[in-house]
Amino acid sequence: MFLHLILLAGLAPVVYLWCTPFIACNQTVYGDFSDIEKGMKVILLGRPFQKMDQLIITGEYYNNGSEVMDDAAFTVGLSKGLIMHQLGMDDLEQYLLTTTLGASEERMNISGKLLGRKKDTFLIVEKAKPNVTCADPFTFVIKSQDGYGFAFGSVQSSELKYTAQVALQYPKNEQSQSVFFDGKIKTSKIEL
């Protein structure tokens, strides 16, 4: 029995990694991460998020047939180390940084709320809104400012514009190594 438990403990990380998309440096993962029935999607980075890195997310909003555009919302976040699936949206304080984006009905722009930890304090910061419509595919960028801080932006007319600066600093041993998605987004391409 003890041997079976050891074998099971050894297989669990292998199955977890096998079922989770993985991005090595300068690679791209293609696929649809919009299945909200199965909950949060996790993407593992081949190494910690470093200075000058950019995570580029291409996709479109998905509001499950609703005519109310602001139903189309999703959360994307960065976590310390390799995230485990049992952490959910009720455990956001466990993550380094998250942002929730939704399409507003009035002008169909993206509104966002940033959450993160700074000196072990969980905080909420309202930031500028990337101008992305929910009717069209969008490109959303998370850029490392210095290896520990982040900027969010969108690509407009093939020009990258960062509309929110986040001055959150983390110790080196807390560099992000995984990204999670939750909510209504059809993701067609994710690049590091």
UniProtKB/Swiss-Prot annotation:
Superkingdom to which the source organism belongs: Eukaryota
Keyword check for Signal: yes
Keyword match Signal: yes
Signal sequence bounds: 1-17
Keywords per UniProt: Signal
Protein name: Uncharacterized protein ZK1290.11
